[in-house]
Amino acid sequence: MQYRVDSKSGNRISALGLGCMRFPGAPGHPDAKTADAIISRAVEQGINYLDTAYLYPGNEVCVGASLERLGLRDRVLLATKLPHASCVCTGDFDRFFDEQLRRLRTDRIDYYLMHNITSPAQWERVVALGIEDWIARQKAAGRIRQIGFSYHGSAADFLDGA
């Protein structure tokens, strides 16, 4: 496996990550045995970056349980995402994040991403709700290690908002 070093954290991240959105199973009910096998095999092959999200039904629970059963939480960099569009007040950041920690059976998220930002206006909305101060508090408490975003808008809008 090839690795890259995150210059901000020093983390050595596998060039290939495991996107955990679509584990086999019924919608909202990923098959635990299959998820265990996929995660185990990925880690055996050197993958150490796992990506999930609040909005992937049943997924965070499945990933958290698999990591616990397999004893792999400390061997992976875990990424999940805030469903920012569902946040209407600052308290929602805590509500979603605390639920994510419970679902993932962990005390920290290595890479916490703002999910599916499609315009600079969406980012401005969560900034107005206090996301920057909230993130700073979570980082200071060690509950979030690094932050980021997944952007799904146009390149032109992104570059205009940068």
Predicted regions, residues:
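Hydrophobic positions in alpha-helices of CheY-like receiver
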Residues: L67, L82, I135-Q138
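Short alpha-helix boundary/capping motifs
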Residues: L70-G71, A79, A128-L129
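Generic structural signal for short, solvent-exposed loop/turn connectors between secondary structure elements
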Residues: L55-C62, L82-D94
